[in-house]
């Protein structure tokens, strides 16, 4: 359980950046489920 918490956090961080990069690059379609 101790090593699962940080792993899930890393995935969340990566997904946030991944969704942010393409969303802003496309022209901000208005898809911000993380915000």
UniProtKB/Swiss-Prot annotation:
Signal sequence residues: none
Alphabetically ordered keywords of this record: PQQ biosynthesis
Biological process annotations from GO: pyrroloquinoline quinone biosynthetic process
Keyword Transcription belongs to the record: no
Cross-link (Pyrroloquinoline quinone (Glu-Tyr)): 16-20
UniProt keyword annotation of Protein biosynthesis present: no
Pfam family, one: PqqA
Pathway per the UniProt entry: Cofactor biosynthesis; pyrroloquinoline quinone biosynthesis
Task performed by this protein: Required for coenzyme pyrroloquinoline quinone (PQQ) biosynthesis. PQQ is probably formed by cross-linking a specific glutamate to a specific tyrosine residue and excising these residues from the peptide.
Family: Belongs to the PqqA family.
NCBIfam families recorded: PQQ_syn_pqqA
Protein name listed in UniProt: Coenzyme PQQ synthesis protein A
Organism, as annotated: Ruegeria pomeroyi (strain ATCC 700808 / DSM 15171 / DSS-3)
């Amino acid at each position: 359980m101790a090593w699962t918490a940080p792993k899930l956090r890393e995935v969340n961080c990566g997904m946030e950046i991944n969704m942010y990069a393409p969303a802003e690059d496309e022209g901000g379609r208005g898809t911000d489920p993380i915000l």
